[in-house]
Amino acid sequence: MVKQLRSQRWIRLLLFIGITLAVASDASAQDYVRDSEPKLFSYDELVQLSLDQPLSPELTEKLRVITTTPFINNEAYYAGSRPRSLNVKDLGPTLRVAFWNIERGLELDDIQLFLTDKDRFMTKVEAERKEAKEKGRSVRDVALEKIPQEIELLQAADVWILNEVDWGVKRTQYREVVRELANTLHMNWAYGVEFLEIDSKQLGTDTFDDKENEQERQQLIEQFSVDKDRVRALHGNAVLSRYPIRDARLIPFKVGYDWFKETKITPLEKAKRKAALLVGEDLLQETRRGGRTALFVDLDVPEVSGQRLTVVATHLENRAKPKVRRQQMEQLLSEIRDVHNPIVVAGDLNTTGSNGTPTSVPNMLYKRYGSTDFWTTQGVQWATGVGIAYSATRGALKLAGIQTRIDPTSANIPGLSANLERGLFSTVEKFRFADGKAFDFRGVPEQTVNGKSGTLADSNQRLGRGFAPTFITEFIWKKLRVAKFKLDWIFVKSELNSPRDKKGSYLFAPHFARTMTDLNNFTPEPISDHSPMTVDLPFHDPSDRGKTSK
């Protein structure tokens, strides 16, 4: 009898504990924001933002809110989506993180296709490459055998960090790019607005009165007309995750480039400043409200220290000198100094060594407005007809020293081998968190996909000389066809106290960094002007590092 009573008590106790845990779990789940976003602008408000006149207090406040308030969506979590089990040989259970500057999302359809139907994507693009070659168009050389594996690597990533993500912009068919991609991946997402794209051509308000030919003027008006009910004009960064999002913050940088005031300078004043002669500075005005930001997202990841992972998506200023980008990075670091859990920082840091990203005229126009066919024909003629003037000779000379700038971590030797980006990397390497931890700067051959070593090789793929370039662009000059840069970076804070300590902990440390150039360049027109990257972060310290396999 006594034993029976004790047994019943234990059963009741276990039931009570089970119910308590279930309730606690449900309560925790209820804490996740299901779908939240700041108020968006109407078309008339966007037009007001584009005018060079003081804003009303209400519009000023609305602009402040949308550039400091992240969108948060955990619908995937509530629909039952959970992280996929990834077990990497000799690493064990692992989190794979992907980063990609997706160039507005101009080729979102191709991204969605390779994520959902690899074979159909391969067949489609092989046919497109064949057709392009038959028409005499050049396509980039790729290793076809690597592409299926690169697709599978991206498919297995449970966290995606994105730059240049459009929302309601005509060039990307007014699509909510982050929402569509998150639906494809069955991921939760956070989105931070950097800019309101309020150039007169983006809003369809340009009347092109400078054109003498009325037929041509009407053609341009039609080309740049917009759907006033669909345009939202947002552009920013995003974090997508199969882990639920606990919280997110959006912090604008205090220093940078004023994309609104600077574009209001007249063409004559710009000519006096010789801005049009600087290769790498955009050749058409790009009027925007807002500025560069850092998006901080806290994910609930039970497998890591503190059961929390902080992910930071950022895009440092291209229209600024390297010292300004370093200052932006310093501000970002100050925001995470007191974070004790693991951190991943990723973004296009624009480490060109100058105040601009080199590009060709057609690519710049396509990136700005979309519609490849238009910009490869009359669009370029129109653009050059309204004052795009620059010196090809000077440009070629200026680019001669930077066409393969693929190791901005190298020493800065003024007069011999200048590298003005070195200061940014020194800042990150010297930085210490409040708990004494540091970012992982190691480059151990056994932890890389190709056996290469050197600074940051574990988290950013290196080649024989420098890093694998993440940005490749063609130019119009015969003697300088291609420029290659390492602009995109991943930094990881795990359990390491010294950035280069090879004997330190490898728990959640970066392994097997990859830059997927072949996949990105497989399509006749590259999917983006930047290639995607991945890094593997093991949930346990690998037991036998010396035998780590690729």
Predicted regions and their residues:
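N-terminal, active-site-proximal structural segment of metallo-dependent hydrolase catalytic domains
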Residues: 3-6, 12, 27-234, 253, ...
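Bacterial N-terminal signal peptides
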Residues: 12-22
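Metal-dependent phosphoester-hydrolase catalytic domains
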Residues: 30-84, 245-250, 299, 322-323, ...
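Short coil/turn segments at beta-strand junctions that form active-site/ligand-binding loops
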Residues: 94, 156, 307-308, 340-342
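Active-site flanking residues adjacent to catalytic metal/cofactor-binding acidic residues
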Residues: 100, 163, 314, 346-349
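Active-site environment of divalent metal-dependent phosphoester hydrolases
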Residues: 105-106, 167-170, 197-200, 258, ...
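Alpha-helix-centered segments that form part of catalytic cores
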Residues: 141-144, 152-160, 230-234, 277-296, ...
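Catalytic-adjacent loop/helix segments of enzymes that bind and process anionic phosphate/sulfate esters
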Residues: 224, 231-235, 242-327
